[in-house]
Amino acid sequence: MGHPEPHFLGYGGVVTGPRELYDAIVAETQCNTAIIDGVLVNDWKDESELEVDDQGNAYTRQFGGRQIFAAFDLLEVDGESLLEIPLLERRRHLEGVLAPSPNVRLTPYVTRGLRAWRDTLQAQGFRRVVLKNWNSAYTPGKTTDDWLVIEKLKAAAP
């Protein structure tokens, strides 16, 4: 954020993202410049609310997927590095500078019950998850011993 052109970086370098999504991130950010760690989710599906039809039958609407940016960490804000600050504090800073919107989401932080979240994360288009120690620092380009990366979310066995 703070660059004149979309500036999404992936593991392999620059990632092309839609200008509208970049503009949405900029519009929802309350600072001049920021380095936000997150993921472009290509097939995001909003959770459906339970509705009732005229005959009293309950149903949920099925919506098509869309691309969103899901933010999960803030690494720098207005030129100040947050890399040495614990994750929980970086999260508080992230919530202070980035407002969630339909196309920009803050990923949930949970302390337990990952099994319950697995189905929700899969339904929303996430394919991997990173479990992090609340007090972990951020090391650019590396997974630390304080993190556990689950590369593929699988459906629960019956």
Residue ranges and their predicted role:
Residues 1-158:
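Catalytic cores of nucleic-acid ligases and guanylyltransferases
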